[in-house]
Curated annotation (Swiss-Prot):
Localization per Swiss-Prot or TrEMBL: Cytoplasm
GO MF term list: metalloendopeptidase activity; RNA endonuclease activity; zinc ion binding
Disulfide bonds: none
Name of the protein: Endoribonuclease YbeY
Stated role: Single strand-specific metallo-endoribonuclease involved in late-stage 70S ribosome quality control and in maturation of the 3' terminus of the 16S rRNA.
EC number(s) per entry: 3.1.-.-
Gene3D superfamilies for the chain: Metalloproteases ('zincins'), catalytic domain
Sites where the protein binds Zn(2+): 116, 120, 126
The keyword Acetylation belongs to this UniProt entry's keyword annotation: no
Gene: ybeY
Length: 149
């Protein structure tokens, strides 16, 4: 897997841990081993501009996902598709506030947002209650497995 992480946020980021988490999630979701992922950490003005440009929402957000080849999780009895999974844009400053509010800190929030973003890249959504249950359940399961290893 090719995982590129760019930190343009001005916030310290454990790039190796983030890459390992991404690889873990992609492996668990049976993403093709040659799939590509780019994660960019940016500041609040940058993510606010992207949020407005692409989501038509004002202000900063925590994570944006830009799927490329519309890859989906692999099935047990099928070979996964090769391609570019997509790009994630994270905002560590927003993550820091959310992590503090949630009581689990910045690093745990960045991990959560990374898993959340990868699931979006794989086609998961949470607009409807059933989708929400499925996506957040899977997100919790992946994070628990990551932290238990």
């Amino acid at each position: 897997m090719s995982i590129e992480i760019l930190n343009e946020s001005g916030h310290p980021l454990d790039v190796k841990r983030l890459a390992a988490l991404s690889r873990f999630v992609m492996d668990r979701m049976r993403v093709h081993p040659l799939a590509e992922l780019c994660i960019k950490a940016v500041d609040e003005p940058t993510i606010a501009q992207l949020n407005e440009q692409w989501m038509e929402k004002a202000g900063p957000t925590d994570v944006l996902a830009f799927p490329m080849d519309e890859l989906r999780p692999g099935l047990v009895d099928e070979d996964p598709e090769e391609g570019v999974l997509g790009d994630l844009v994270l905002c560590p400053d927003v993550a820091a506030r959310q992590g503090e509010t949630a009581g689990h800190g910045t690093e745990a929030e960045i991990e959560l947002l990374t898993v959340h973003g990868i699931l979006h890249l794989l086609g998961y959504d949470h607009a409807e209650p059933e989708e929400h249950r499925e996506m957040f359940g899977l997100q919790d399961e992946l994070l628990a497995a990551w932290r238990a290893r």
